[in-house]
Amino acid sequence: LMHTLWPRTQALNFKFSWFPSPLYLDYDERLAAGRPRTRYAIDDYEGMTFWLALTVEQALPKRLQTRWPDWLGFAVGYSARGMHGANVKSRGREREYPELPSAHPEILLSLDYDARYMPAGGWLWEEFKQQLNWLHFPAPAVRVYPDLRFYLLYL
């Protein structure tokens, strides 16, 4: 609705990325050792990152738009680590790990690719590209909180 009422807001999009965390990948080993774990990908919150992506070209003044690649943008990401129930406020089934550090957020800055600018095709391909644009693809990134860290490819 916001994009329809205010077309300039189309320069902002929400995106999602996921890369399996050790809580998910090492489930069997963690289960045997009695350590925090998650069985299902949908519950692997440590592996998820949520992004607010800016389509830079749409946000630039008209005279500068020709100098910026259509498909390249920036994104701000939010993720969390330590989501294993160690926090005192945790009510989850894994709350019995008080010796582990509490969860903490991570803030990232990254390049972003706009899938809508992939080569043209038929109507089905065009619809597919629109759906791909909900995903944040691996790209260089910098974690700015809680500390500074560079990722050649943030998955």
Set out the residue ranges of the language-model regions.
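Hydrophobic alpha-helical membrane segments
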Residues: L1-L155
